[in-house]
From Swiss-Prot:
GO terms for molecular function: metal ion binding; ubiquinol-cytochrome-c reductase activity. The keyword Transferase does not apply. Heme b b566 binds at H97, H196. Heme b b562 binds at H83, H182. The gene is MT-CYB. One of its GO terms (biological process) is mitochondrial electron transport, ubiquinol to cytochrome c. CDD domains: cytochrome_b_C (cd00290), Cytochrome_b_N (cd00284). This is Cytochrome b. Binds 2 heme b groups non-covalently. It is found in: Mitochondrion inner membrane. The cytochrome bc1 complex contains 11 subunits: 3 respiratory subunits (MT-CYB, CYC1 and UQCRFS1), 2 core proteins (UQCRC1 and UQCRC2) and 6 low-molecular weight proteins (UQCRH/QCR6, UQCRB/QCR7, UQCRQ/QCR8, UQCR10/QCR9, UQCR11/QCR10 and a cleavage product of UQCRFS1). This cytochrome bc1 complex then forms a dimer. Gene3D superfamilies: Cytochrome Bc1 Complex, Chain C. Heme 1 (or BL or b562) is low-potential and absorbs at about 562 nm, and heme 2 (or BH or b566) is high-potential and absorbs at about 566 nm.
């Protein structure tokens, strides 16, 4: 009798994706982040669902409802901090996942890569709207500043901003619609994840060498299921430690002050995971130019496959490209630091230099070094 997991209409889909899936034998721990992102999404949807049962999306009661969750709801504090810090873990895994794709040349699977970029935008939008919901000072002013950027769009900008706000300022209508979209988007993200996996399983996984691994495949279960479970345990240990020992480490103290439209905080800044893009936005003195640079800082990932001119797929055997890649990582850390600093000397010039370097490395230096390495291969 044939095994039920191979014949049942639903089970055979799961079987072909997670059990009998042929996987390259050389996958390193850098390939763990896809499954870790799945766990993060599950944690966020579950904790978010329970938080939504107690949260009220009204400007008069939103801040108090979050306080009520923390003080009066059984384990409400745990749910709230798991959700807030879960977002940070989500972005850590997300950036490492994208970094892995850049380093090992996974972007040559263009459909999977493009769906991944779409997922990145969707998760960023979800996180931004979620940050507005507690209705603290940074929530309110963050929402005001970031949505106001759309007014830089010629001709329709002002109308577009007022349409998003649902009025002439960030108010009750804005909060209600942000809550609705923040609840809806994770399910759209989950659907996009399915499409992401569908395209990935069409081509099979890349591997650290960048060389086709068809002659050397192993079943996903038990080898990579065990490896993934170890990854889950490490990540959940890190998340639990953050939540239980220093839950406010990555947050902003200003968000414990109720939103006040009449009092602007001295330094308006988004959550840490958006600071690199915020630094790029601020480094350009023109509003429209800043907005374009902000969008391009993420959208630039879409042209990376076009800029790949190397004869080798992975950077594993390309030391010059490796140096450039780690310089790019250093630039991103610098931008993240600058995004959290006030707009004054010397931070302005450091931010502008780092922003120029960011685009220069990806658009010009990476392809140039790849061509140099191609030339060196002939020697």
């Amino acid at each position: 009798m044939t095994n039920i997991r191979k014949t049942h209409p639903l089970l055979k889909i799961i079987n072909s994706s997670f059990v009998d899936l042929p996987a390259p034998s050389s996958l390193s721990s850098w390939w763990n982040f896809g499954s870790l992102l799945g766990v993060c999404l599950g944690v966020q949807i579950l904790t978010g669902l329970f938080l939504a049962m107690h949260y009220t999306s009204d400007t008069a009661t939103a801040f108090n409802s979050v306080t009520h969750i923390c003080r009066d709801v059984n384990y409400g504090w745990l749910l709230r901090y798991l959700h807030a810090n879960g977002a940070s873990m989500f972005f850590i895994c997300l950036y490492l996942h994208v970094g892995r794709g850049l380093y090992y040349g996974s972007y040559t699977y263009s459909e999977t890569w493009n769906i991944g970029i779409l997922l990145l935008f969707a998760v960023m939008a979800t996180a931004f709207m979620g940050y507005v919901l507690p209705w603290g000072q940074m929530s309110f002013w963050g929402a005001t500043v970031i949505t106001n950027l759309l007014s830089a769009i010629p001709y329709i900008g002002t109308d577009l901003v007022q349409w998003i706000w649902g009025g002439f300022s960030v108010d009750k209508a804005t909060l209600t619609r942000f809550f609705a979209f923040h609840f809806l988007l994770p399910f759209i993200v989950a659907a996009l994840v399915m499409v992401h996996l569908l395209f990935l399983h069409e081509t099979g996984s890349n591997n650290p060498t960048g060389i086709p691994s068809d002659p050397d495949m192993i079943p996903f279960h038990p080898y990579y299921t065990i490896k993934d479970i170890l990854g889950f345990l490490i990540m959940l240990t890190a998340l639990s430690s953050l939540v239980l020992f220093s839950p406010d480490l990555l947050g902003d103290p200003d968000n414990y002050i109720p939103a006040n439209p009449l009092n602007t905080p001295p330094h308006i800044k988004p959550e840490w995971y958006f600071l690199f893009a915020y630094a790029i936005l601020r480094s350009i003195p023109n509003k429209l130019g800043g907005v374009l640079a902000l969008v391009m800082s993420i959208l630039i990932l879409a042209i990376v496959p076009t800029l790949h001119v190397s004869k080798q797929r992975s950077m594993m055997f390309r030391p010059l490209s490796q140096c450039l890649f780690w310089l790019l990582v250093a630039v991103l850390f610098t931008l993240t630091w600058i995004g959290g600093q006030p707009v004054e000397h010397p931070y302005i010039i450091i931010g502008q230099t780092a922003s120029v370097l960011y685009f220069l490395i990806i658009l010009i230096l990476m392809p140039a070094i790849s061509l140099t390495e191609n030339y060196l291969l002939k020697w």
